[in-house]
Amino acid sequence: MARAVGIDLGTTNSVVSVLEGGEPTVIANAEGARTTPSVVAFTKDGEVLVGETAKRQNVTNVDRTISSVKRHMGTDWTVGIDDKKYTSQELSARILGKLKRDAEQYLGDSVTDAVITVPAYFNDAERQATKEAGEIAGLNVLRIINEPTAAALAYGLDRGKEDELILVFDLGGGTFDVSLLEVGKDDDFSTIQVRSTAGDNRLGGDDWDQRIVDHLVKRFKESTGVDVSNDKIAKQRLKEAAEQAKKELSSSTSTSIQLPYLSLTENGPANLDETLTRAKFEELTNDLLERTRKPFEDVIREAGVSVGDVAHVVLVGGSTRMPAVVDLVKKLTGGKEPNKGVNPDEVVAVGAALQAGVLKGERKDVLLIDVTPLSLGIETKGGIMTKLIERNTAIPTKRSETFTTADDNQPSVAIQVFQGEREFTRDNKNLGTFELTGIAPAPRGIPQVEVTFDIDANGIVHVSAKDKGTGKEQSMTITGGSSLGKEDIERMVREAEEHAAEDKTRREQAEVRNNAEQLAYSIDKLIKENDDKLPEDVKSEVQGDVDGLKSALAGDDEDAVKTAFDKLSASQTKLGEAIYAQGQQEQAAGETPEGASEAKKDDEDIVDAEVVDEDDEDKKTDR
């Protein structure tokens, strides 16, 4: 039976998890690690590498190695490799495809369904692009859920029997979210409802790394006079060193960064040898840390609670291991110690697997209620953003509002859909436009156009407009900035499946050949063993088909092998019929008078017995 998995598609690393016996298990990849780098590399000989093997290409193959793709989801960003442009969806699909294969190898079963997580603050275009990436990878995306929600799902189910507020502080490689969730507990059922969420999709661990890189570039120029800011290979080496330094500074107060032969000068190779203290690192990145403060405060304010009402604080994402982040969270929550019982790299995937289990009926003890992170509305006269659905509204949801025309005899209205919190549409994200035509001529203000927003459980928006006078209706599903039509997705799915299809064809051809060789051998043997029992015409016909199949097997024409195989499969039944008929004739010939005499002689030794009641004094036995 095909299995469903939960996938955390991260900026830096990705994780896949599955329910086994109702409990989540993180699946190790083919390399034995529980996290897979979200990196794709194209080698010069045409091979596509994903994960750790791709990450190792970062320095030697810098122009053909792509990382942090998640930051480009929902945009028209592309990268060119060998005269072919790849979208963020296609590259993300490569990562998802590896996770899918690794899960299938671990489970020994096919994986078709998945719940994929996204940052809570992802807009509609970014969510749609994530769903498309899953489809390209050959996955049926059961649900797109928010990362903090998934983390709370994984964390909250095992915590006591009381109703509690859980605050999730999620700082990943490329995105940042804060969510406040309420976990309601009954005896055997839990309801997890998102109360509010806020974040910054352009803030993550990559930005902390970049500050170290900028610092090292500056120090290297000061000490050697060489500016490596435009040297791609040097910058990549610095980036890897910066990431490692950041990790080391989480447990040490200083770290040494040594990069020999980083560049060349007139006097020979120039080496980098720097010591970075935690204090200096925190000074370099203090403004980044401060950017996490406002979303935290917004979430508390919009939920209408005080910090003291929060029962648990959960840190999610590898970047929350930085001591400065932990200290800030403690300060913001009034000294509350963040929970240390969850793995920040894995908890989101675990929650996604639990949600997959809920959707597939494997877990029936939890209900998840998420929210839309940004307000949705349309543009009305003057470029005003008229909101139909406010941010932090529970989803799925549906809202309608009636609008009218701005001019006399206006024959149509353009419905421009926006997402965001600003008062004017020009400052918000344009999700798309469609036109409702055929409005009956009438003075301005008379026609009534009902606009309906419908947000599904994935957070994806559907919009419709209906003229109440004529009954005419127009609708659209927002695809935002992903720029992928149905044909594009189908083409990418075909390309992603191309190699798998080739392998499948080769395997099927090999199976046909194996079956054909086995059939030819077994029929050949059957004919030889029953040579005297087979009529010449049957034997000649079937032997001819055997020889024909052997001849086809000697060649490379797979269609000829299949045709010859089918022909012999049909004609071989005549052998069975002939052998069975011969056996019946021999049996009939064997019923001779001598045989009857022998039967009579044998019968003399048979006792005929009549069974009667034991109490019957007249019981008798005839011999």
Curated annotation (Swiss-Prot):
One GO molecular-function entry: unfolded protein binding
UniProt-listed InterPro entries: ATPase_NBD, Chaperone_DnaK, Heat_shock_70_CS, HSP70_C_sf, HSP70_peptide-bd_sf, Hsp_70_fam
Region of interest (Disordered), ranges: 580-623
Swiss-Prot/TrEMBL keywords: ATP-binding, Chaperone, Nucleotide-binding, Phosphoprotein, Stress response
Pfam families from the UniProt entry: HSP70 (PF00012)
Regulation: induction: By stress conditions e.g. heat shock.
Segments of skewed composition (Low complexity): 580-596
Sequence positions bearing Phosphothreonine: 175
Superkingdom as given in the UniProt entry: Bacteria
Biased composition (Acidic residues): 604-617
Protein family (similarity comment): Belongs to the heat shock protein 70 family.
Chain's role: Acts as a chaperone.
Matching PANTHER family: HEAT SHOCK PROTEIN 70KDA (PTHR19375)
NCBIfam families per the UniProt record, alphabetical: PRK00290.1, prok_dnaK
Protein name per Swiss-Prot or TrEMBL: Chaperone protein DnaK
Protein species of origin: Clavibacter michiganensis subsp. michiganensis (strain NCPPB 382)
Top-level taxonomy: Bacteria, Bacillati, Actinomycetota, Actinomycetes, Micrococcales
Gene that encodes the chain: dnaK
